[in-house]
Amino acid sequence: MKGSRWFIVFIVAFLFIMFAIEYHLPKNFVWKPTFGHHDEQPFGCAVFDSVLSSSLPQGYTFSRKSLYQLEQEDTTQRRGILVISDNLRLSDVDVNALLKMAERGDKIMLVSTLFGRYLEDTLQFRSYYSYFSPMALKKYATSFMKKDSLHWIGDSTVYPRQTFYFYLQLCSSYFWGDSLPERVLAQRVFESNEFRYETEVDSLTTDSLVYMPVAMSRRWGKGEVILVSTPLIFTNYGMLDGKNATYIFRLLSQMGKLPIVRTEGYMKETAPVSYTHLRAHETKANL
């Protein structure tokens, strides 16, 4: 009986130790893009926001307001507005609000793979969307395939030209080269055969390389609208991916010395009531 009791004690102790070890082991990563302020997974923004709030001397704050709500705020201080999403289909109300803010001198940075036709028509650009697959990213990373390159070509008097390397799935969306931006900040480089295969377009180019913008800006009034097609880089993963945080800071530096407000108002679970719904409610209340 005494031996059995010690055996039971040993088993219980062993199970307790194994439970403690498993509890402290790193949890499996979830590669779903959320861009959430409290999400510590690779494609959340908990670390991203924390680093920026402690690194940007001009200030970095977080909001859940829509562009319309931000535009309606009574403030004389100019700001940088940052919106990160994988599907930013802005309505005409959103677009008009952001253009009003830019007109006054604010700088608006929109980071997404999709922007909506109204904004594209207004600013005269077109984007190429590529679907993100976590399984494809995992397969690409574990096969040790060569990373794709993004070339910084912004103002060389401020930053030297530099090449940054990312997995293909993080930078597979871009803007068409015949878009009419005022200034290209960064571009992705394709081999011409790869470009024809990916876009299914019969390119007439005879060059061996094709350059497509992934970040560009356009002045609007006293301010600026900055478009970036690689939202997965603006995450915890992108911030912690070796030296690639430099790429993020270069893009954010386009807002100059303005304090930056990142709004989470266009995430599905936190999206505010739309302007049209607000107006409809107000109309009913006044009847």
What are these regions, as identified by a protein language model?
Residues 2-71:
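Aromatic-Pro/Gly-enriched surface loop or interdomain linker
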Residues 34-39, 85-86, 237:
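Second-shell loop/turn segments in exported
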Residues 42-43, 89-92, 242:
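Soluble non-cytosolic domains of exported or imported proteins
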Residues 64-144:
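Membrane-embedded segments
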Residues 114-204:
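An acidic, glycine-rich "communication" segment
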Residues 174-273:
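A glycine-centered loop/beta-turn motif at secondary-structure junctions
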Residues 276-285:
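Conserved small/polar residues in nucleotide/adenosyl-binding loops
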